[in-house]
Each structure stands twice: as C-alpha cells, then as structure tokens.
Amino acid sequence: MPRAIQIKKQGAAGVMKWVEVPVGKPKRGQILINQSHVGLNYIDVYHRSGLYPLEMPHGIGMEAAGNVEAVGAGVKGIRVGDRVAYAAGPPGSYAEAR
C-alpha cells in the first residue's frame, strides 16, 4: 500500500505523519501517478499550521511529478508510462501515489 504524509491536527512540523493510504483505481477522467518527486511550497506550511485550515485528517502538498501507472476511462492523450507533472489542488501530493 502506498504511503503519504498526513496531518491529523494543525501544528509544527512534528504533526506530519508517514502513513499507509489506500489508492483505488482511477475513475472516469482520472489517472493514477506513481510519484517520484514532490514540490515543497509555502502554502503547505499554511495548511499544516492552520493559517489555511483543512478538514482533518488530510494530506498536504500541491505539486508532484511521476509516471502514469493507470488511466481511467475517457482520458485522452495520456498513456500508462507517460511522465507527468501537476501543480493543483486538492492538497495531498506528499505521497508515493495519487
């Protein structure tokens, strides 16, 4: 099972925990990415500290890159094995797969 950094409460860096998270098959219009790189952005500190609060528990991070592992129905122009990157919400990019 893939792992991700998750927070269950706002606070200092110590509230971030490395946990296993279920990742299902992509739904229509979605892809599954085996992430190899994540971007660190100051908004992640805002989410973690509570300046921009999230519902808990929640993943953090807004950008990542990796290889496409699976493609949902209706996706065009992206195939399994393609290298991709994104910088968009919802938060949760601090993860091995998404």
Across the structure, where does each feature detected by a protein language model lie?
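Short polar catalytic/cofactor-binding loops
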Residues: 8-12, 38
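A short glycine-rich beta-alpha junction/loop motif
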Residues: 95-98
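Short structural boundary motif marking the start of a folded domain
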Residues: 1-5
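Short beta-strand or tight-loop elements
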Residues: 14-19, 64
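Short N-terminal binding/cap micro-motifs at the start of the first secondary-structure element
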Residues: 12-16, 42-43
